[in-house]
Amino acid sequence: MSSPHVLVVDDTHVDRHVISMALMRHNVRVTAVESVMQALVFLDSEHDVNMIVSDYCMPEMTGYDLLMEVKKSPRLVHLPVIIASSDNIPERIRKCFDGGAKDYILKPVKIADVPRILNYI
């Protein structure tokens, strides 16, 4: 079996790097982009993504917006979406779960978080 492929979406370079490195230490193939629009373009052309890990707070479109786009697409609806945020806001967390997110993890993402989120693949 080939390594799982995770799309990481975060507007902050450092956070993209931290999440990507944590995933790669678990033999995960990572594609990292800095915006929801870049993620949507990538998802439109790439068919072997197994999961999305997205920041919540980003300019223009949020991680929740990405979640909604994924869940309304017949081709993508099956993809597990994990929301990562430095904000521990119960209403936001509930909204993401209600929208179909598989998990909501607090940043910074730690190596110990990775096995849990990989279980969603």
UniProtKB/Swiss-Prot annotation:
PTM sites of type 4-aspartylphosphate: 55
Signal sequence bounds: none
Tissue: Expressed in flowers and panicles.
Domain Response regulatory: 5-121
PTM field: Two-component system major event consists of a His-to-Asp phosphorelay between a sensor histidine kinase (HK) and a response regulator (RR). In plants, the His-to-Asp phosphorelay involves an additional intermediate named Histidine-containing phosphotransfer protein (HPt). This multistep phosphorelay consists of a His-Asp-His-Asp sequential transfer of a phosphate group between first a His and an Asp of the HK protein, followed by the transfer to a conserved His of the HPt protein and finally the transfer to an Asp in the receiver domain of the RR protein.
SUPFAM superfamilies: CheY-like
Keywords, sorted A to Z: Cytokinin signaling pathway, Phosphoprotein, Transcription, Transcription regulation, Two-component regulatory system
Disruption of the gene: reported phenotype: Dwarf, narrow leaf and low tillering phenotypes.
InterPro entries tied to this protein: ARR-like (IPR045279), CheY-like_superfamily (IPR011006), Sig_transdc_resp-reg_receiver (IPR001789)
PROSITE patterns (alphabetical): RESPONSE_REGULATORY
Gene Ontology BP, a term: cytokinin-activated signaling pathway
Pfam families named in the record: Response_reg
CDD domains: REC_typeA_ARR (cd17581)
Gene3D superfamilies: 3.40.50.2300
Protein family per UniProt: Belongs to the ARR family. Type-A subfamily.
PANTHER family per the UniProt record, alphabetical: TWO-COMPONENT RESPONSE REGULATOR (PTHR43874), TWO-COMPONENT RESPONSE REGULATOR ORR8 (PTHR43874:SF33)
UniProt function note: Functions as a response regulator involved in His-to-Asp phosphorelay signal transduction system. Phosphorylation of the Asp residue in the receiver domain activates the ability of the protein to promote the transcription of target genes. Type-A response regulators seem to act as negative regulators of the cytokinin signaling.
Protein name: Two-component response regulator ORR13
